[in-house]
From Swiss-Prot:
Full protein name: Bifunctional 3'-phosphoadenosine 5'-phosphosulfate synthase 1
Outcome following mutation: R37A: Abolishes inhibition by the substrate adenylyl sulfate
Keyword Acetylation included in the entry's annotation: yes
Keywords per UniProt: Acetylation, ATP-binding, Kinase, Multifunctional enzyme, Nucleotide-binding, Nucleotidyltransferase, Transferase
Role noted for this protein: Bifunctional enzyme with both ATP sulfurylase and APS kinase activity, which mediates two steps in the sulfate activation pathway. The first step is the transfer of a sulfate group to ATP to yield adenosine 5'-phosphosulfate (APS), and the second step is the transfer of a phosphate group from ATP to APS yielding 3'-phosphoadenylylsulfate (PAPS: activated sulfate donor used by sulfotransferase). In mammals, PAPS is the sole source of sulfate; APS appears to be only an intermediate in the sulfate-activation pathway.
Pathway annotation from the record: Sulfur metabolism; sulfate assimilation
Length: 624
């Protein structure tokens, strides 16, 4: 908020400076730019297109202008829309620090801001201004400055009753104004002229910040400033309830393609919207973009690094090619319809070389690919019913839409996600605890952890999902992670062990579910080379790639140093090469060996109850 009256020391201006708005130079000629706005729009931001405009937030001190403006700025930047906020307090500390709060100075304050905002808008940015700007004429002048330059101007009245603004008065300025300690305070002894015909009114006494931001975004979408697809709404592929009976009847009459369990897991991924904006299994154009660029490029740069494809044999192609639709059948049940199918060659070796960086047939997922059909099928997917596995864990399989709602219900102002396919040890917990601490230090009040184990296919020697979920529950029970600020859910994707390529998929899927931050540690989505036993991928590359990956714009990557067991401190700690002798690296192989033999790990490596779950799992294998 702007601080008026005696709280702002007014600097005495020279005569020339005092009258500068009245002087007119005769030797100044406007210079036209060589770069057009359309050309500038091609290189500003990640989506292309000129979006320059000004969103002018006006309202009483304490109405919520700064809160809305900063949240709107964050939203737009995270969705690839370049923007910048000019805040009243900030500007009065620099450009306008020589202005006070007289009517004349308020007028000059607004004029300067309008001119600067016009330049920002002309550069292709969405310029958000957050000023009391109490006078109608001054705001009209700001509009005229923009209209004279053929730039859109949107006046947004941030409307909160005076008594609400006084209740929010964390700096006590209204109290001082009521006591006469501040003179000329807007709303108390200086008039605020409400906008007569603003483009938008935000009732901040009854709407939360997110609702206000969405209202402004919708306005900008209506005026073709922000593309509709920039909001990354989750695209679920379930048939709507009112069309379900007809679709099921249709499915029974269509030819069918049998699919396996991994295919069904990908059906679930698509149906729930994890692969937004895909309409179904990738068509050839999408497949090639994914394979060669790790992105979808139609409608902006959208990170999608792993092919989500359906395979078919030559016999299936001969039978189904030419059909306008066919059903997908899993375990004798028709679960989905694929419409307008497109068949194209499944070049397996090329796919594996690009996706995994190897064609080693002993790699578990590559082995599956090499055994699949020689054709790929893309098409629009309609899933008939929600996917349930009836394994006692379906309550953890929350969709992106459900997760977003849960975070909202928890009043989360930051969501940080942790992907894992292994049991949680205290090194993992250290990363999550430190992230929570960092977010609090950055000013977030309610950061929430999404502990999100992968729930699709994994290789044979990985701990099964059921046991991992029991182990995660024990970690929470022992208080290693805070149950009050942690959401445990299952991510339905199969595991591909594709290293830096796959970790981008893991990250962007959590982005769709509402995560703002993504924790990445050592060798994400990696595994030992099936033949040499060495790391298939350089362990630090996954984190490095994520920090550079295009299209992951709505969340921030949180890379961490390697955690190892500190023998002196008897706990997991960040590895320090200068004290190498103090550290011990406990590999997954050794951890499994200890658990299998019923031995205890070093003190502080894992929560005791969580370790007990692991030993019980390996004992169950011996009995089997």
């Amino acid at each position: 908020m702007e601080i008026p009256g005696s709280l702002c020391k007014k600097v005495k201006l020279s005569n020339n400076a005092q009258n500068w708005g009245m002087q007119r130079a005769t030797n100044v000629t406007y210079q036209a730019h060589h770069v057009s706005r359309n050309k500038r729009g091609q290189v500003v931001g990640t989506r292309g297109g000129f979006r320059g405009c000004t969103v002018w937030l006006t309202g009483l001190s304490g109405a919520g202008k700064t809160t809305v403006s900063m949240a709107l700025e964050e939203y737009l930047v995270c969705h690839g829309i370049p923007c910048y906020t000019l805040d009243g307090d900030n500007i009065r500390q620099g450009l306008n620090k020589n202005l006070g709060f007289s009517p004349e100075d308020r007028e000059e304050n607004v004029r300067r801001i309008a001119e600067v905002a016009k330049l920002f808008a002309d550069a292709g940015l969405v310029c958000i201004t957050s000023f009391i700007s109490p006078y109608t004429q001054d705001r009209n002048n700001a509009r005229q400055i923009h209209e004279g330059a053929s730039l859109p101007f949107f006046e947004v009245f941030v409307d909160a009753p005076l008594h609400v603004c006084e209740q929010r008065d964390v700096k006590g300025l209204y109290k001082k104004a009521r006591a006469g300690e501040i003179k000329g305070f807007t709303g108390i002894d200086s008039e605020y002229e409400k906008p007569e015909a603003p483009e938008l009114v935000l009732k901040t006494d009854s709407c939360d910040v997110n609702d206000c931001v969405q209202q402004v975004v919708e306005l900008l979408q209506e005026r073709d400033i922000v593309p509709v697809d920039a909001s990354y709404e989750v695209k679920e592929l379930y048939v709507p309830e009112n069309k379900l009976h007809l679709a099921k009847t249709d499915a029974e009459t269509l030819p069918a393609l049998k699919i396996n369990k991994v295919d069904m897991q990908w059906v679930q991924v698509l149906a729930e919207g994890w692969a937004t904006p895909l309409n179904g299994f990738m068509r050839e154009r999408e497949y090639l973009q994914c394979l060669h660029f790790d992105c979808l490029l139609d409608g902006g740069v959208i990170n999608l690094s792993v092919p989500i494809v359906l395979t078919a044999t030559h016999e299936d192609k001969e039978r189904l090619d030419g059909c306008t639709a066919f059903a997908l059948m899993y375990e004798g049940r028709r679960v989905a319809i694929l419409r307008n199918p497109e068949f194209f060659e499944h070049r397996k070796e090329e796919r594996c070389a690009r996706q995994w960086g190897t064609t080693c047939k002993n790699h578990p997922y590559i082995k599956m690919v090499m055994e699949q059909g020689d054709w790929l099928i893309g098409g629009d997917l309609q899933v008939l019913d929600r996917v349930y596995w009836n394994d006692g864990l379906d309550q953890y399989r929350l969709t992106p839409t459900e997760l977003k709602q849960k975070f909202k219900d928890m009043n989360a102002d930051a969501v940080f996600a942790f992907q894992l396919r292994n049991p949680v040890h205290n090194g993992h917990a250290l990363l999550m605890q430190d992230t929570h601490k960092q977010l609090l230090e950055r000013g977030y009040r309610r950061p929430v952890l999404l502990l999100h184990p992968l729930g699709g296919w994994t290789k044979d020697d990985d701990v099964p999902l059921m046991w991992r979920m029991k182990q995660h529950a024990a970690v929470l029970e022992e208080g290693v992670l805070n149950p009050e600020t942690t959401v445990v859910a299952i991510f339905p994707s199969p595991m591909m062990y594709a290293g830096p390529t796959e970790v981008q998929w893991h990250c962007r899927a959590r982005m769709v579910a509402g995560a703002n931050f993504y924790i990445v540690g050592r060798d994400p989505a990696g595994m030992p080379h099936p033949e040499t036993g060495k790391d298939l991928y350089e362990p630090s590359h996954g984190a490095k790639v994520l920090t550079m990956a295009p299209g992951l714009i709505t969340l921030e990557i949180v890379p961490f140093r390697v955690a190892a067991y500190n023998k002196k401190k008897k706990r997991m700690d960040y590895y320090d090469s200068e004290h190498h002798e103090d550290f011990e690296f406990i590999s997954g192989t050794r951890m499994r060996k200890l658990a299998r033999e019923g031995q205890k790990p070093p003190e502080g490596f894992m929560a005791p109850k969580a370790w007990t779950v692991l030993t019980e799992y390996y004992k169950s294998l011996e009995k089997a």
